[in-house]
Amino acid sequence: MSEIKALAERSAANPAALGHDLDLEAFSREGPAWDYDPDYRQFAPEERSHLLKAGIELTDEEHAGTFLQADARVVHCRANQEGVEVLPIIEALAKHEDLADHLWHLVAVDADKYTARAELALDNGYFIRALPGAQVAEPVEACLYIKTDRFSQHVHNIVIVEPGASLHIITGCTTHPGVRSGLHIGVSEFYVRRGGSLTFTMIHNWAEDIHVRPRTGVLVEEGGRFISNYVLLRPVKSVQMYPTVTLAGAGAVTRMQSIFIAHPGCELDVGGRVILKAPRTRAEVIARSLSLGGRCVSRGHLVGEVPEVKAHLECRGLILSPQGVIYAVPELEGLAAGVDMSHEAAVGRIAAEEIEYLMARGLDEEEAVSTIVRGFLSVKIEGLPPALEEELDRAIQESGKGL
């Protein structure tokens, strides 16, 4: 048994340090062997509509590459532009001998039972690489799709942006309209090489009884840029994630922004950590959380290890239900003289004067609250295709209705 397998075996029962603990045996590993689908013909109109809500357009047009995994099977995978490589991770590991060195390098296999399960019972996942100097104008679209009720999906993704390259990935994670429960475990390791740029947009559109456990590590080298956008607007049972970005090279930059809604019965424990290890690195972490009756823990952690670093953390939350709970947990850790780090955190309700101001201009109370909520959740995400931008705007509009 390899050392990695042994570590996974020893940690297979270890609960995560944060978030709601799960019984992994409560979920199923049985599901149909879905056929490969080069033309997306197996997807009914209802499925297509559901996938679009997670940003997945089911077309190879205007995409530099596409990847779709249904349960345990990769059903579509294609690179459509020179300079981009898109493969299932198992195939990529067989093709590139050195890729194994990137596996479990940024995320510890023995972090908890979820990382262990991803190693011991891996389904697949994606490998996406932008070749040196490639300027990839159109996004790569990746979808992780639970199509069978109660299925436990385990994926491991690796993204490499080679020196001087630029890449945008849009990942949609969702379920079949008929699926009510299940578990998604997703390990992701991103490498942004010297002078490279990666924008990663993740949109979740799960079902009400789905549990989600992403585990993400990012390494950004000298002069590199990593932009992360995370959107969760629809009901889910629980999400626990705490991605860590390491700015390892001088002048590296990251911006992490997220918007999420905790619906009744939902438990979210989400956040982001940035470790600034080199001079002139910069980081910005922005979170917008809204509780409609669910529980949300919004975390942020900035670690400045050397002088001449600058970072800001902003956590804002709105509670719109008597049953709603939001915890904002900002942390600043300065380990050297000359760091410049700040945070701003606010949790509360909509001020009465804001509602009165809008009502004085002709809106009724419900319309006024809805308008304020839409403005609170509206965060500009760069590089979205028009159809996806319209769908995201529509989802934000819907989230403000009936409050």
Which residues does each PLM region occupy?
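Extracellular glycan-modifying ectodomains
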Residues: 368
